[in-house]
Amino acid sequence: LGRYNDFPRVMLGTDGMHSDMIRSAQSSYFIAGLAEGGMSPLAAYQRLRAVHAHIQGHNAPGGGANNLVILNYDSPTPLTQDNFPGHFCYAFDARNVESVISQGRLIVDHGRPAGMDEAGILAYANEQARRLWALL
């Protein structure tokens, strides 16, 4: 595998496999642990956060102070600023995302998409998936 820090500018993504960025960061952390030098929980968290520097460096919208993720997490052990990355790598998952504000707009409210027809979107996605699979 080499060393994970050979590519410090590599960010995380889901590549269409799933939409869970927390899971992607955790996978990165565990896979990097197999490589020479490993990766700390803080380094895995910083990789996830690197997208903000990329967005700001390219003057793209998003990544500003008007974005917020609110987690609902009942920690079985004390949660501090120092051990937050460890909780992030070992305990958090998408179920903990309670609300998300993106560019000042509430887009997830109490774990559900806000301001959109979730059932309609899922039905449309299902229809398009059937069309795609028919072509494959």
Language-model features, listed with the residues they occupy:
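His/Asp/Glu-enriched, well-ordered alpha-helical/loop segment
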Residues: L1-Y73, F92
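Active-site microenvironment of metallo-dependent hydrolases
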Residues: A44-L136
